[in-house]
């Protein structure tokens, strides 16, 4: 049975693949921080520390990747322009066209993180972050993890642990250069995918 979600994915993926087929694979690789293997007709990239390979020219995925994760990768490869990655962090609401959808996502994510963090120890959180490909970095937050969702598309998860006065809380942030690589619709999808992975690891 073809659901509305499946149809939407298929239509958007087809459009993205057509755009990519019209471009030079070598140029796509350079602009996106990926690797082009002309001998084997493959484009290789990394998402959350995992290797992802696409068969050219149809840009089909070798590994099993969830549909909307596939679409984000295709859109990233299409939009990437090799803009240097900024270390300046912004909220989803600060993205171009992010005032409504991005701001709503920021609020929803803070609520989801509050539920996710409840009852988890600092050590548990470190283990979950590591299992999802995150890197612990210095920050004013109690815990700050950087996730390279794609080569030039980092996210930062900042966590403040619970104390006598406050419950644990968190924020998910993007790079100021994020608009050069994905539109806000895909950005919120990326945030959702990362949250799902964090939950999945914590449930194991």
Regions found by a protein language model. Give the residues of each.
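Short Lys/Arg-enriched alpha/beta "domain-start" segment
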Residues: 1-40, 69, 76-133
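Amphipathic, interaction-prone secondary-structure segments
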Residues: 28-56, 135-161
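Intrinsically disordered, low-complexity regulatory segments enriched in Ser/Thr/Pro
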Residues: 50-75, 160-185
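Short, charged/polar micro-motifs that form catalytic or ligand-binding hotspots
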Residues: 63, 111, 115-118, 143, ...
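Generic structural signal for hydrophobic core residues of well-folded globular domains
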Residues: 74-81, 194, 198
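Conserved binding-pocket/active-site segment within a compact domain
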Residues: 120-180
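A recognition module on extended beta-rich or small alphabeta surfaces enriched in W/G with H and D/E
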Residues: 175-204
């Amino acid at each position: 049975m073809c659901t509305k979600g499946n149809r939407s994915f298929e239509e958007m993926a087809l459009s993205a693949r057509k755009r990519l087929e019209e471009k030079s694979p070598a140029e796509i690789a350079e602009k996106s921080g990926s690797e082009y293997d002309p001998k084997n007709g493959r484009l290789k990239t990394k998402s959350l520390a995992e290797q992802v390979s696409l068969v050219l020219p149809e840009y089909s995925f070798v590994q099993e990747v969830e549909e909307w994760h596939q679409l984000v990768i295709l859109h990233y490869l299409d939009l990437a322009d090799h803009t240097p990655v900024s270390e300046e962090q912004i909220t989803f609401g600060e993205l171009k066209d992010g005032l409504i959808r991005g701001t709503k996502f920021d609020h929803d994510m803070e609520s989801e993180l509050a539920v996710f963090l409840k009852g988890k120890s600092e050590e548990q959180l470190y283990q979950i972050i590591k299992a999802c490909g995150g890197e612990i970095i210095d920050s004013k937050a109690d815990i700050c993890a950087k996730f390279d969702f794609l080569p030039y598309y980092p996210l930062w998860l900042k966590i403040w642990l619970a104390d006598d006065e406050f419950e644990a809380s968190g924020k998910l942030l993007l790079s100021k250069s994020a608009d050069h690589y994905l539109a806000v619709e895909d950005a919120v999808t990326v945030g959702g995918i990362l949250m799902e992975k964090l939950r999945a690891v914590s449930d194991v």
